[in-house]
């Protein structure tokens, strides 16, 4: 067992996919701060988005990007002016067990999977404190992340 595996064994975590967002631009997806021990994440499966986090420069996200918030910080994903209202969002029936939401935006399509990692709050403090407020992994064109790219393609179906 390597060092990282031993470290992660000390901090058991769970993960869950919460919702699939299939939006046409313009859209604004705001997420409030999560509770202790909850780290939300988003996988950009198709299209693009902008990420706004208070006190941080805005980031451009594209298909293949994974963004994680180890401290559960509030953030906004959007493809428009983040201060404007987006096209109304509503839930649709889906063949999958995953909740799916869409909007009536008629612009470029962005497909996002949203989920969260959860740890016991008192156990996770030491590990998560060492991480920045936002982690971005760009898988597009990264040969060493081929397994992660394959997983994202599988989840897209």
Where in the sequence are the language-model features?
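Generic protein-terminus/edge-of-domain signal
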Residues: 1-66, 73-103
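Residues immediately flanking
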Residues: 46, 71, 117-119
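Short hydrophobic-aromatic micro-motifs
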Residues: 67-70, 112-114
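Amphipathic alpha-helical segments enriched in hydrophobic/aromatic residues interleaved with Lys/Arg
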Residues: 101-157
């Amino acid at each position: 067992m390597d060092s990282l595996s031993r470290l992660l064994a000390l901090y058991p975590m769970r993960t869950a996919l919460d919702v699939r967002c299939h939006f046409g631009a313009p859209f604004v997806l705001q997420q409030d701060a999560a509770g202790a021990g909850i780290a939300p994440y988003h996988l950009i499966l198709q299209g693009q988005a902008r990420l706004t986090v208070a006190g941080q420069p805005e980031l451009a996200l594209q298909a293949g990007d994974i963004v994680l918030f180890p401290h559960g910080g509030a953030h906004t994903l959007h493809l428009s002016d983040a201060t404007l209202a987006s096209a109304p969002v509503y839930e649709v029936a889906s063949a999958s067990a995953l909740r799916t939401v869409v909007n009536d935006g008629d612009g470029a399509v962005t497909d996002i999977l949203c989920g969260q990692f959860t740890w016991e709050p008192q156990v996770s403090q030491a590990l998560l404190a060492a991480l920045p407020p936002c982690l971005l992994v760009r898988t597009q064109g990264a040969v060493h992340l081929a397994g992660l790219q394959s997983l994202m393609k599988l989840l897209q179906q």
